[in-house]
Amino acid sequence: MARKGILGTKLGMTQVFDENNKVVPVTVVKAGPNVVTRIRTPERDGYSAVQLAYGEISPRKVNKPVTGQYTAAGVNPRRHLAELRLDDAEAVTEYEVGQELTAEIFADGSYVDVTGTSKGKGFAGTMKRHGFSGQGASHGAQAVHRRPGSIGGCATPARVFKGTRMAGRMGNDRVTVQNLLVHKVDAEQGVLLIKGAVPGRTGGLVMVRSAIKRGEK
């Protein structure tokens, strides 16, 4: 079975009840419809993948090189393009150019990995960015309460090691959360109810793929 995936939009979080009347927090993801615009094969490209297109956009806003890709695939231009890597060469036989993918590719109770862009927090200090404890609030501490402390020795090593955790820009990173449970698939509305939190803001683009660390349930 080829690894499945779909592009979608995060709509927000809510809560539903399971069969035991327990509250389940879920993220609602508008999944698809996606269209397959290109198929990568090991013989031609060196790897196996399918290119997925998603979202509405005015054709006037798409440049000519990208428009040519859509024309070759025989589909209307879309807002987003992404590649879904496949496990092996045989997996590409399950896809064809122009094929439409919807939320129904997943089933209730399956596990997925969700990739999105985390919310940007701007410039943040070490306490917020890395969870530092800070320094004393009293007993002679003056204007150092949220400072990081020492970042290295003076004479040895006489430099700051690469990767030292310091203040800086926080968020707006590509984040993947693995092994999230698909609580319910609403095929009529084209949405997935995924248990737990999903990276990114409401309205952000996400890629939902079958979990790589768990087999098909």
Curated annotation (Swiss-Prot):
- UniProt keyword Metal-binding present: no
Which superkingdom heads the taxonomic lineage of this protein's source? Bacteria
SUPFAM superfamilies for the chain: Translation proteins
- Which keywords does the record carry? Ribonucleoprotein, Ribosomal protein, RNA-binding, rRNA-binding
One of the record's GO molecular function terms: structural constituent of ribosome
- One Pfam family name from the record? Ribosomal_L3
Q: Name one GO biological process term.
A: translation
Q: Which InterPro entries match?
A: Ribosomal_uL3, Ribosomal_uL3_bac/org-type, Ribosomal_uL3_CS, Transl_B-barrel_sf
User: What is one GO cellular-component annotation here?
Assistant: cytosolic large ribosomal subunit
Subunit structure of this entry? Answer: Part of the 50S ribosomal subunit. Forms a cluster with proteins L14 and L19.
PANTHER family, sorted: 50S RIBOSOMAL PROTEIN L3 (PTHR11229), LARGE RIBOSOMAL SUBUNIT PROTEIN UL3C (PTHR11229:SF16)
Q: Quote the HAMAP family the UniProt record gives.
A: Ribosomal_uL3_B
The protein's job, in short, is: One of the primary rRNA binding proteins, it binds directly near the 3'-end of the 23S rRNA, where it nucleates assembly of the 50S subunit.
Family membership noted in the UniProt record: Belongs to the universal ribosomal protein uL3 family.
- Its recorded name reads Large ribosomal subunit protein uL3
The species is: Mycobacterium marinum (strain ATCC BAA-535 / M)
Q: Which gene encodes it?
A: rplC
